[in-house]
Amino acid sequence: TPADTGLLTPLEVEDHTYLYRNEYTLPLGVMVPYDLEDNWQLDITNPADVQNDLAVVLGADPVLEEVPSEILGTSFTFTPEVSGDYYVYVSNKKVEKVSALMGENTKSFDNVNRGYMLELGWITAGEEVTLRNDDNEQDLVAVAYRFIPEGLESVYHVLNRNSMELTKKTDTEITGRIDTEKAGLLYLSIPYDKGWSI
């Protein structure tokens, strides 16, 4: 199950609602290398390659692993050898709607031509997965990936090694301190909002 990956710790269950703690939550600010923006290849069309490239640039392990698959015209199929979280990237931009059949479960995806990763969820080893182009007669050219929990753990440890400790937090001010092994860029995970200053 997803809980077996060590990424989430179950905290509470009430009716059919589950509460988990994410074990790999980063603090508000972390140090990244000066050359991150120059070396991280953001213009790659496949988002899985962009994520893996970030991991490599940081000096960590990849977070997504390509799995063997087969393109059968308007269908795409694969059978995982390992249980885990699986994703598919459809590279044919003429495909807009895709349905995924995983055992007895189905999922539908719209706007696939926007180039996002299709999150299939947890799939058990040996369970065949079939995706179909529900939109037209275009070939379903795609790539399947398994999420690698150890890769995320590796990225987390690299980023968390030099992280910011909050010393004050109010509605209008955030103060913190950071000790770092070497000079770099301070990355803050605060979305831009007019009125804030550093």
Each predicted region: which residue ranges?
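A cross-kingdom signal targeting lumenal/periplasmic-facing segments of multi-pass membrane
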Residues: T1-E81, D85, K93-K94, M117-E119
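Active-site-proximal, structured, solvent-exposed surfaces of multi-pass membrane proteins
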Residues: A55-S197
